[in-house]
Amino acid sequence: ISDSVALPPNQPEVLLAGTRVAVFEQGTGELWLVNAAELSTFDAQSDSTLSLGTDAMVSMDSAGTLFAYSPSAGLVYRVNTASSDGVDSSQSVTVAGTSSSRSISSVGGHWVILDTQTDSLLVDGRTVDLSAELGTGTGAVLQWPSVDGDRVLVGYSGGLVAVSLGSGAVSSLVTDTAGSPARPLTLAGCDYAAWSNGQNWRRCGGASEGATAVLASMPGTARLSFETNGARAVLNDRRSGATWAVQRAGELIDNWDEL
C-alpha cells in the first residue's frame, strides 16, 4: 500500500464505478462524489455533495447510477454520477422497519429496498410481500447492484427468490439450503448465490433452472461475499480469507497463478 486516504470517521463506505467514487458516511448521511483520480486528495472536511440525514442508505451500480434513500426527507434520490453530481430525480416513499432492517440496491436502473422486519420489498415504490416465500427463513439479503436485469434476487437462509421488476411476481429459485447467505450477484449474464453450508448456485444465459454445487472446505462460520473485477467474480469468506472460483467448477483457489 503506497497511499492512504483519510475517510470520514463515522462509519464510512466507499463505492466505486469506473472513474467515479462515492464516499458515504453512514453515521451522518453525508455523501461526497469525487473523481477517482482526485481520491488521494479527498478531504472529509470539505462540503458534501448531498446531505441525506441519519439512517440513510446508498447504492451504486457499475455504470455509476446511484440511488440514495433519505428517511428524514422520505425520498429516494437518483444521481447519474457518470455525468453529473446533481440529483436527476426523486421519489417520495414510506419505508417500514428500522434502519438496521433496511437495505437498498438497484437492478436495470430500478431501485429496490428490502425490509427484513416486515419481509417486504419496495420496487420503484410498489410493495411486494415476501413473507410467504421466506417463511421462517432468516438473514434475507438483496443482490448486489446490477446494470442489467428485469428481476431482483433475494437470498435468505432457506433459499433464493426472484421478484419481477415489472409485475412484482415472486418465484422461488432455491428452497432446500441452509446457512447464512451471501448477497446474490448478477454479472455478465449469470446469476450467483451461495450459503455458509457450502451450497453454491449458478444460472447463466437465461436457463430456466440453475445448477447447484457444494463448495469444498467451507467453514460453517463463513461470512461470504461475491467479489468482482469487471466481468470476473469469486466467492470470498471474509473471516478466513478462503476464496472459491464460482465462475469455473467452484474449486477452492490455492494457486492464483494457475487461475
Predicted features along the sequence, with ranges:
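Surface-exposed loop/turn elements that mediate protein-protein interactions on large endomembrane-trafficking
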Residues: 1-10, 28-51, 72-97, 115-137, ...
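Repeated scaffold domains used in trafficking and secretory/extracellular systems
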Residues: 3-20, 26, 45-65, 90-110, ...
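A generic structured-segment signal
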Residues: 232-233, 243
